[in-house]
Amino acid sequence: MELDAVSRSYKRWAIYDFSFGKVSESPRRRTAAHVNARGGRVLEVGVGTGLSLPLYSHRVAVTGIDFSHEMLARAREKVEEMGLEPVKELRQMDARELDFPDETFDTVVAMFLVSVVPEPERVVSEMARVCRKGGEVVIVNHFARDKGPLAAVEKALARFENTLGWHSDFAIERVTADPRLEVVEQTPMSPGGLFTFLRFQRR
């Protein structure tokens, strides 16, 4: 998927917070609770409009990045309006080229991102690079089913991925190959197992 297609699809979703917020609420809460329990420096890659930002506690110091200026503007409004002290910085950035030194963060999170960006393997590689050894990389996303009636539906929808901004047949293997990352948890999440909580330890 090309970056300009991603940007266009986000602009078309003027009601993004409302339409996607409810669907993603449970996975976001579960992920934020895990991150809060760990504490430390956190990078959220693809922070979007900041749907997850109110969920972070004072145990963490959060940096958020996104490619979309429009989404970041909305995220900044939320931080200011809600007084979100755990959020320390929001920056415009390409997730394939993160402008941070190696091993900067204790936890690196990407929610609902890897199937809607170009070169997701590069994104995961960068997430691994900026995560400290012994830290965690957490990816929450929809991954393709390999069997059952929904698998056929996902393959059919994949033809429209640039229009929808959603890659329905995205294979989990595309984010599990980095040798620096060891999968330590893979858990289906509501609604209906649509999303997967994928947790890695940084070697």
From Swiss-Prot:
EC numbers, comma separated: 2.1.1.17
Record-level GO BP terms: methylation; phosphatidylcholine biosynthetic process
Q: Does the keyword Translocase apply?
A: no
Query: What CDD domains would the database entry show?
Result: AdoMet_MTases (cd02440)
The yes or no answer to whether the keyword Cell inner membrane is present is no
Q: Which domain of life is it from?
A: Bacteria
Keywords per UniProt: Lipid biosynthesis, Lipid metabolism, Methyltransferase, Phospholipid biosynthesis, Phospholipid metabolism, S-adenosyl-L-methionine, Transferase
**SUPFAM superfamilies, per this entry?**
S-adenosyl-L-methionine-dependent methyltransferases
Pfam families attached to this UniProt entry: Methyltransf_11
Database matches in InterPro entries: Methyltransf_11 (IPR013216), Methyltransf_Superfamily (IPR050508), SAM-dependent_MTases_sf (IPR029063)
Q: Which GO terms describe its molecular function?
A: phosphatidylethanolamine N-methyltransferase activity
PANTHER family tied to this protein: METHYLTRANSFERASE (PTHR42912)
Protein function: This enzyme catalyzes three distinct methylation reactions for converting phosphatidylethanolamine to phosphatidylcholine.
Q: What is this protein called?
A: Phosphatidylethanolamine N-methyltransferase
